Amino acid sequence: MNAPLTPIVVQYLYVHEPEEGFYYPTARAGRSAAQVAQRYLECALAQVASLAYREIPCDLILAMNVTDRSVLGRAGTDLLAKIEELGATVLPTPYTHRPKPGTEIYVSSRYVLDAIMTSTEGIDPGRQVWLTDLDCVWADPARVFASAPPAPEIGCVFIDYPPDWDTVGFEAHGRTRNGIGELAAAMGAAGGAPPWVGGELLTGTAGPLRELVAACEELDAQLAAGDKTLPNEEQILSLAGAVGRIHFADLSAVARRITTGPRSHAAHVTGFEQIGLWHLPAEKGLSLRRTAQQVRRGHTRRLRRDLSDPARTAKRFNVGDTGPLRRLRDDGWIAAQRIRSITPRPAGG
């Protein structure tokens, strides 16, 4: 009997060109392309650690467009080296599925389409590929891997936005679930408010994933013929599902976007023990960064202990109850990062 094929976990990071315009709405993002890349490499390292330190049987890939690592600065280069040291392969991936020229918000969001193409090239057609946002933590990898839908379905996370909730904030079309439904109806589909496909997780085997990219390309061409555009990946993925080109399977029972911390007006998180993949966008400058710093410095004893215990894992990443002292520490951490963000840095830092 053949042994099951090892899954592939793919993260992807587009590093902006030095003169490229981009916008991130948070102070923690930094002022330069190198600083933005460093913040996201911290997330990537934390995610790799959440798998590598448990010796989870999977292959780890980080798709990147960088060929000259010096553009990452010293800190970024060190982070990337540590990611490789933990067993991840850096996969050169040019960005060819960009939004229209001039887009500065969500400019990198469609990079997942290129990561699909490079990570699935030449692999066994039966291997399951898991593409995740960088700011994710694998709390229960086995639970997530066991949820893989049968081919040709594509696993994802449906986000339960209200039908008229504007998730994009610019451009004229497809900004809401109803807006995606209107575009789908114009293409001959039933219309209505289709599910919104989140970008934090996509999973499938090579053939269906590559068909997903082809479907997005064809839909982009149809939209462009009518002088319409969808700037981010969640919009075009949702449209692909709405018109019936791709059948998406909702994995929100095992993977979810979790809002953390009072600064994000987060509600108390319940049922996190059943969620195997946590998407933690509010933790970029907090627990994910602290974890990356510990890995980078070799101070991993507590991290390994935390990852071996679900309750400790939840506390580390601010998913479980943390108490007022932890919140006070987080507030101090944020203040320190904001001060640092306006302090001049040495060249190459």
Residue ranges and their predicted role:
Residues G155-L183:
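A short, conserved beta-to-alpha structural element at the edge of catalytic cores
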Residues Y95-G102, P163-D164, A255-T259:
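A short acidic, often aromatic-flanked loop/helix-cap motif at beta-alpha or helix-coil junctions
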Residues M1-K100, D124-P125, A314-G349:
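N-terminal anchoring/stem segment of glycosyltransferases
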Residues V9-V10, I61-A63, V90-P92, Q128-D133, ...:
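A structural signal for short, well-ordered beta-strand segments and their strand-loop junctions
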Residues T103-V112:
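A short, glycine-/small-residue-rich helix N-cap motif at loop->alpha-helix starts
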Residues E182-E283:
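Catalytic core and acceptor-binding pocket of nucleotide-sugar-dependent glycosyltransferases
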